[in-house]
């Protein structure tokens, strides 16, 4: 694999967002919040630019197909959403409900709900697969099986929890 695993990249983004909001809740300094948010945005942008340039230099071969698929397990997302809402309910009924805590929970719930609809753009090349433009996997790293009855190709990539089903034999 060359690049960043897109599944863990988005989890890292959620942790960065949670840490920024937590620091805001602790310090209550809007200047520190703006500096952290801007610094994180610049850092992530620089990392993405570096990785995309690095991946552009890789010899991928000819583009065969481009598909969009959803990764992740919906059961874990629902459990995480229930945990966050349960914690929000606990804080609400304990009487220590702050406006900043409301914002924090709105961010986490919105991020979790948005993951239900997150689709990844997958480009299939002769020499491998490019996911979201930030991760390139060669065919040696991918476990590929075909289901000729349903005319499907099933790809299992290490580090991505869900199999990718393509409605065409590659």
Curated annotation (Swiss-Prot):
Keyword Membrane in annotation: yes
Transmembrane segments: 6-26, 31-51, 91-111
Subcellular locations according to the entry: Cell membrane
Major localisation: membrane
A GO cellular component entry from the record: plasma membrane
Topological type in the membrane: Multi-pass membrane protein
Keyword line: Cell membrane, Membrane, Transmembrane, Transmembrane helix
Domain of life (superkingdom): Archaea
Similarity-based family: To M.jannaschii MJ1249.1, MJ0210.1 and MJ0785.1.
Name of the protein in its database record: Uncharacterized protein MJ0795.1
């Amino acid at each position: 694999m060359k690049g960043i695993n897109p599944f863990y990249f988005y989890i890292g983004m959620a942790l960065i967002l949670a840490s920024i909001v937590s620091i805001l809740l602790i310090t209550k300094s809007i200047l520190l919040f703006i500096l952290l948010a801007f610094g994180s945005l610049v850092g992530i942008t620089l990392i993405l630019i570096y990785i995309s340039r690095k991946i552009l230099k890789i010899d991928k071969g000819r583009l065969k197909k481009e598909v969009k698929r959803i990764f992740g397990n919906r059961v874990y997302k629902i459990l995480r959403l229930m945990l966050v809402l349960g914690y929000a309910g606990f804080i609400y009924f304990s009487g220590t409900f702050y406006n900043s805590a409301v914002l924090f929970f709105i961010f986490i719930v919105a991020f979790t709900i948005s993951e239900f609809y997150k689709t990844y753009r997958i480009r299939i090349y002769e020499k491998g697969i490019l996911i979201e433009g930030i991760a390139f996997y060669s065919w040696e790293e991918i476990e590929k099986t075909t289901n000729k009855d349903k005319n499907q190709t099933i790809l299992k990539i290490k580090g991505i929890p869900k199999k990718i089903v393509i409605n065409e034999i590659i």
